[in-house]
């Protein structure tokens, strides 16, 4: 059973509907105790890094997540802002500490790229590692992105990259911790396949 963490950061319903389409049992976790009854966790999110961390703290999710992920070793998937929160720090609205599951930081796309910010739309993945999330998904497949910030971290954690002015991290994996910068719930059949792969872990 997959807990979708509700910390007032959007796109929960679309993720829940995507899991329903593939027959994966899920529920909305509205408080930290709810995480105990799940065998997998999902941290969605759209919006500001700083505001999201503030909400997680106020709702009591930060310590609960660290317990469930780092001690209990439950698989977790972070989507978009959810992925970014896994890092040590972000710079949206000033320096802000993240969950620290993965070493690295979250920075904004440079303004001088002559590209529209946010990066919005379909983009091709360069899959670098055959991780469980990409089982049955071909390299150069397209997924849907909406973001103004991107992750900088060690290559050892990067499972895929995409290109927008320069190459950036499209997905991460560190042991049982998985994350995508793109939105699988908005990425049609391939996105459903990725969510199915996570549900089957």
From Swiss-Prot:
Domain of life the protein comes from: Bacteria
Q: Where is the Glutamine amidotransferase type-1 domain?
A: 1-201
According to its UniProt entry, one GO biological process term is: L-histidine biosynthetic process
Cell compartment(s), UniProt: Cytoplasm
UniProt protein name: Imidazole glycerol phosphate synthase subunit HisH 1
Q: How would you summarize the oligomeric state and partners of this protein?
A: Heterodimer of HisH and HisF.
Where is the major localization of this protein? cytoplasm
Q: Which UniProt keywords apply?
A: Amino-acid biosynthesis, Cytoplasm, Glutamine amidotransferase, Histidine biosynthesis, Hydrolase, Lyase
- List residues traversing the bilayer: none
One term of GO molecular function: glutaminase activity
Gene name, Swiss-Prot/TrEMBL: hisH1
Instruction: Please name the pathway.
Output: Amino-acid biosynthesis; L-histidine biosynthesis; L-histidine from 5-phospho-alpha-D-ribose 1-diphosphate: step 5/9
Biological role stated in the UniProt entry: IGPS catalyzes the conversion of PRFAR and glutamine to IGP, AICAR and glutamate. The HisH subunit provides the glutamine amidotransferase activity that produces the ammonia necessary to HisF for the synthesis of IGP and AICAR.
